[in-house]
Regions:
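N-terminal short beta-loop-beta anion/metal-coordinating cradle
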Residues: 1-69
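Mid-sequence, gly/pro-rich, charge-dense loop/helix-turn segments that line enzyme active sites
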Residues: 83-131
Length: 131
């Protein structure tokens, strides 16, 4: 299966610096204040962009990336705000479920992490797309 161009987002410059430095045929384009770095990593055409910290920044940046560059897949790289013990720098983590750990609707009867859909007594877990 081929995904064509791949989009890669990272919250901070340090999360993208090595990838940007490795780009062949690099170019830059600014869209809505976001600096997109285009080029090739190996045989793959890529678009790299720093989105800023937080899920709203990531969502906004991802939508601009999709609208302007139409990547076949989007990868989020970086530290991902790791909360699990036992992880070391350089470990690769692949999610099998996504929870908004910072969402708290407890004042209206939902447990922390529940986004007011489904069971109000359990966090809402979103399954990632299979690759």
């Amino acid at each position: 299966m081929s995904y064509g161009r791949i989009g890669v987002i990272g919250a901070m410059d340090s999360e993208l610096a090595a990838l940007i430095a490795a780009l062949a045929q690099p170019a830059q384009e600014t869209v809505q204040g976001l600096v997109f770095h285009t080029g090739r990593l190996g045989v793959r055409e890529v678009v790299l962009v720093r989105c800023g910290i937080g899920k709203v920044s990531a969502a906004r940046c991802t939508q601009v990336l999709i609208d302007r560059f139409a990547p076949g897949a989007v990868i989020n790289t970086g530290i991902a705000g790791g909360l699990a013990g036992g992880l070391a720098v350089g470990d690769i983590v692949v999610a099998d479920g996504l929870v908004q750990h910072d969402f708290d609707a407890a004042p209206i009867g939902f447990v922390r992490g529940c986004v007011c859909m489904g069971d109000p007594g359990a966090p809402t877990v979103f399954a990632p797309d299979a690759v």
